[in-house]
Each structure stands twice: as C-alpha cells, then as structure tokens.
Amino acid sequence: MSAFRRLQVCAATGLIAAGLAVIPAIAAGTQTFTGKVSDAMCGAKHTEAGIDPAACVRECVQKGAKYALVVGDKVYTLDTSDQATLDQLNKLAWDQAKVTGTAHGDTIAVKSVAAAK
C-alpha cells in the first residue's frame, strides 16, 4: 500500500471515529429529570444543625454555588443564566422539581423548570 493510500485510510478512519464520538451527544438530546432542588456545594446533604435545608440552598447559591438537582444518588449541577429560571429554582429550593434540559456528564443545561406534581 502506498504512503498516500495509507494516509487516506488513516484520515477516513479518524473522520469516522470523530463522527461516532458525536452520536452519544446527539442521541442524548433534551430530557426531563425529576428530583430535589439543591445546590452544588451541599448536594444531597444539608448537615448544618439548625438550618432549614431550603434556607441552606438559598444561602449557598447566594454565596456563589450553582443550583443542583438530586436524582436518587446522583447530583446534577444545573447550568442556566436565565433569571426567570433562577427565580423558579429559588422558589423550589429543597422541593421536588421537573427540570428539562440536556445532560452533559454531571451537568444539565436547563431549558425549563417546573414544580413536580
């Protein structure tokens, strides 16, 4: 096989591999997650004695932590800069919520938030 042909095969293989790497991100798409609204600092555990967990969430967010969603044993950091969404998350602190968005590892890019019924 000529050097040029090997280069073509390697380039084609690389393009195929790159395309396959994108498929999981495309397949993931928008999902709805139901869980408890928390913050990324405390996650599922609000252990400071005498502090209401909802107040703890709000205080941690005020100090710079991002909101989070606790789904079973998993804690997702919620990524949004939309003020209406942030206001809704503040209102739902330590309550059950439905969050719609796209998951990227442990982070959800939030599209919408609503109280879970």
Predicted regions and their residues:
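Bacterial N-terminal signal peptides that target proteins for export
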Residues: S2-L15
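Hydrophobic h-region of N-terminal signal peptides that target proteins for export
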Residues: L15-P24
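Conserved RNA-binding domains used in RNP assembly and mRNA/RNA metabolism
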Residues: I23-K117
